[in-house]
Amino acid sequence: MTSLLASEGGWQTFTLKGGEWAILGLSGAAAILALLVGWFLVIQVLKQEEGTDKMKEIAEAIQVGAWAYLKRQFRTIGMILIPVGAVVFFTSVAINKPEVDGGGEALSQIQSGLYRTIAFVLGCVASGLTGYIGMTLATRGNVRTAAAARRGSMKDALQVAFRTGGVAGMFTVGLGLLGATVIIALFQNTSSAMLVGFGFGGSLLALFLRVGGGIFTKAADVGADLVGKVEAGIPEDDPRNPATIADNVGDNVGDCAGMAADLFESYEVTLVASIILGVAAFNSVGLNPALGLVFPLAARAIGVIASIAGVFAVRAKEGETNALKPINRGFAVAGLLTVIGTFWLAFQYVGNPDKGAAGFGDKDVMMSWIGLRLFGAVVVGLILAQVLSRLTEYFTGTEYGPVKEIAESTETGPATVVLSGTASGLESSVYAILCIAVALGATLWMGGGDIQFSLYLVALCGMGMLATTGVIVSEDTFGPVSDNAAGIAEMAGELHGETGKILVSLDAVGNTTKAVTKGFAIGSAVIAAVALFASYIETIAGELGLKDAAGDPLEGSAIFLAAETQINVSDVKTFIGLLIGGSVAMMFSALAIRAVGRTAGVVVQEVRSQFKDGGIMAGTKQPDYGPVIDICTAASLRELTTPALLAVLTPVVVGFGIGYAALGAFLAGVILTGQLMANYLSNAGGAWDNAKKYIEDGHHGGKGSDAHKAAVIGDTVGDPFKDTAGPALNPLIKVMNLVALLILPAIIKYQDNDGVRFVISGISLAILVAAISFSRRKTESMVAA
């Protein structure tokens, strides 16, 4: 019998033979190739010209500020990770072999806990390293992009900016694939426990980087806009604004380090979910279960090769002025190669036997068309990624109706701007979740009625969404690099003539690519969470020791049909879990947005105090950039703890306090409201931002008009929506799912011991309440600190 503890790390029955070991070897080779290509791109970017002395001076100030922030952030995160690592260790369980594999203990509780804790730490390191590398290169590629534009070369500027992003992309896919490959090669039948630890580490660190970086960047941005644009009437990135360097630093620590880590954990969690579910899924349809384990690795390796080709395919043709066209060509190359490679893998490696099925959805003949089903699930993911991208582009692009409608509403003041942007964001969220629902329905249909195999296809759909992650990360990092390049040129007095045209064009395209990649991350978070939710149900069955009429452990679809594994919302306690889960995204968003608002208030006070005597505007005094950087750094690090505790402790409170069924409903609530809120916040913020840019292009009175001032207020409201709260909901959803998997065995073990349950949930609740109370303190306390 196949062990059912797939998600928690129970023994999985399979044997890696020559073909599977070859796939592991090729997967590792593809990962190493990605890292080598990343290093090659580093060398290529750094050898480019840096421009004038003034440009170098400004770039160095941004580098110093970004590195100082990241160093302090990693130190703070390190202290938080120590107790979390202890939780990972103590929630581990011994792993026993089933009788068919000889019985006995495969790993003791101490061994399992030690190995999983090490995997957790390595996941943290890999995610942090991805963010660090992405940010480090971005703070060096920005000035080189500006220098290339200064030479009048659109082609060179695009290549430098995109290949700077390509460094982060290659290290994201390389480290993610290498980590999973090494864990499977070392632990084999017990690897799923270590993969959960590795994925949890990556997700938790991504949450830290997303929240901390988002607070820093948007506090500086909001403060700079409110005083600079609205009150002083000076343009964005004007060197007279004391917050402008902090604003540019924030682009790197938030949009580069944060997003790179975010996409790393999305990439890793979808891979982990596919690997975890693969063994049981292939066993359920009578195929070699080892194929289900290595197929996701092979598919990821194909995606890595395709991403490398896609990054190098991004080249502007002579006379081409729209950078989005070559970027889309690169993405198309990567997508096409992924489709071709996955088709070959599914049909030639797994096979596609036809047992005479009456139709594609015929559940009675599950051996039919397996290869086609696997290929179809990956393609559905690729299509979903494109649909969500186009949907995001429609609701946030300056050439489409929603943004033009928001821009038109500026004629009647900031209130109507906020109302129209809110409506647009809410509407976009509905369409996004409907698209995801259709994709989930399609993959379930492809499963032919076998629930376990269908859920494996759902995980593969998530993998398909992020198959070209190397290019996706490159696109995202391209945004802040081009934004910084324009800022450096502005502060150095170089943003004019052909240089200005090139950099403004790249910046506009960068805003589009940033918005699009947020759609990728949000959609993949939901797909991955659904797959992990399936693992949660499997773990319940295994921990409860559910058996069929013959006395054998439940397998396949029977696991999901058993009464004990049902999440029944008609049960009041279960429904309470659903309600709490639905509220978490709201609380998390409130914490993040409040932190930005509070910190921005302090930034505004600092900038106003420097402008007060008129010396900066008169040119008799230089602005002091340091205090604003210090304010944003201190505040963002101070605000890290509460969102992290909310993500880790809320599942503990619900699981131990109410029960495992309530925790399952809690996860369902988190997935639903988290997805809706993430899309709403990201798209509303993006629409407000681009409505402002649309007006700055000369519409509705242009810069300096009343309409422009109203648009700036809308953009200011949207900043923490799209760059702090919205994106950080992605790792929040996955962290909570992974925490639930980690603690589920302990919840079931102590479900009849009220003393232990209430002590654990009570202490966790007390810590959580104290943290939330601390986060609600007034601004004055922060100023005093």
For the regions a language model picked out, list residue spans one by one.
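Hydrophobic packing and interface segments
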Residues: 2-785
